[in-house]
């Protein structure tokens, strides 16, 4: 594919999204996110050769929220391997991202690492043997390394906002603790969790960080192997089946790519062998996924023939 076609397609989609009035609703249960301008939109595609096609607010940082769960899972698998799956499953939940219902039925084992309970369990594993500040520093440095950008930071105002209002997450963590799923003090685990969800990145930085997932675990520009090809495929499989809460099936149906959303309005998507894609629009749909983000990605895969299920 020519870079001219990619640039033109991204620019056209960004222009189309800017003109739409159906933008969804910003997350209002996290006070800092409720203040975000709903008119924002950014899109970045980085192809296998490292060419960057950007449109809209491509360099405006936003709160990545649950997209961080892809990277904490990657770290945890590197530390503990398959022991991760003793704490968390690999099945779609079919329920809201902060639901406690399945934890009650399944003795505190979360369905997958991308719902809140699952990500808290994964965070607890990363924290084990470390102080919270050390674990959080490891996560942040990993993100900076993947994006090749040491300027990536944590938005402390967002983290504090989540800590003040994250009662449902506290309930999830305490419930898992009662079943012995968490090893560390709940307050420590939640502190690290809230802070890695509050990492702020632009679409450009996020697409760069996700490149290893599009290329069999390897960054094609640096040649660095982040994970094995098999592990990259398995992370992508989980992103496809579980990456969008109870909207994962709809995303797979319409977009046809592995992806992970966050309530900050971002989506990281992977076109295996082709590109890493990041889109941001803060208005959400009923499942907590970016409304225009999904529409933009559907348009992108249709026009470029990138769905993993065929043209």
From Swiss-Prot:
Task: Output the InterPro entries linked to this UniProt entry.
Answer: Beta-lactam/transpept-like, Glutaminase
Which key words are in the record? Hydrolase
Could you give a single Gene Ontology term from the biological process aspect? glutamine catabolic process
Class of enzymatic activity (EC top level):
hydrolase
Q: Where along the chain is substrate bound? A: 66, 116, 162, 169, 193, 245, 263
MF terms (GO), sorted A to Z: glutaminase activity
The Enzyme Commission number assigned here is 3.5.1.2
Q: Which reaction does it catalyse?
A: L-glutamine + H2O = L-glutamate + NH4(+)
Which positions are tagged coiled coil? Answer: none
Q: How does it assemble?
A: Homotetramer.
Name the HAMAP family for this protein.
Answer: Glutaminase
Family, according to the entry, reads as follows: Belongs to the glutaminase family.
Q: What is this protein called?
A: Glutaminase
Its source organism is Rhodopseudomonas palustris (strain BisB5)
């Amino acid at each position: 594919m020519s870079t001219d076609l990619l640039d033109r397609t991204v620019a056209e989609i960004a222009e189309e999204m800017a003109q739409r009035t159906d933008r969804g609703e910003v997350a209002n249960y996290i006070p800092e996110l409720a203040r975000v301008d709903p008119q924002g939109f950014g899109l970045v595609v980085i192809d296998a050769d490292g060419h960057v096609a950007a449109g809209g607010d491509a360099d405006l940082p936003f709160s990545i929220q649950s997209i961080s769960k892809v990277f904490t899972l990657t770290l945890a698998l590197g530390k503990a391997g398959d022991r991760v799956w003793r704490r968390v499953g690999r099945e779609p939940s079919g329920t809201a991202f902060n639901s406690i219902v399945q934890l009650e039925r399944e003795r505190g084992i979360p369905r997958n690492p991308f719902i809140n309970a699952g990500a808290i369990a994964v965070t607890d594993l990363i924290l084990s043997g470390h102080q919270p500040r050390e674990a959080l520093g490891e996560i942040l440095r990993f993100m900076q390394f993947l994006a090749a950008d040491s300027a990536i930071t944590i938005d402390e105002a967002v983290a504090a906002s989540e800590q003040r209002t994250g009662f449902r997450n506290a309930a999830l963590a305490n419930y898992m603790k009662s079943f012995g799923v968490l090893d560390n003090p709940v307050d420590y685990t939640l502190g690290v969790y809230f802070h890695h969800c509050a990492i702020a990145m632009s679409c450009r930085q996020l697409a760069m960080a996700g490149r290893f997932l599009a290329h069999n675990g390897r960054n094609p520009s640096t040649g660095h192997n982040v994970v094995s090809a098999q592990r990259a495929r398995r992370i992508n499989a989980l992103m496809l089946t579980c990456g969008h809460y109870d909207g994962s099936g709809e995303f797979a149906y319409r977009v046809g790519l592995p992806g992970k959303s966050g309530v900050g309005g971002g989506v990281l998507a992977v076109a295996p062998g082709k590109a890493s894609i990041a889109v941001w629009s803060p208005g959400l749909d009923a499942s907590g996924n970016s409304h225009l983000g999904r529409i933009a990605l559907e348009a992108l895969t249709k026009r470029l023939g990138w769905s993993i299920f065929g043209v």
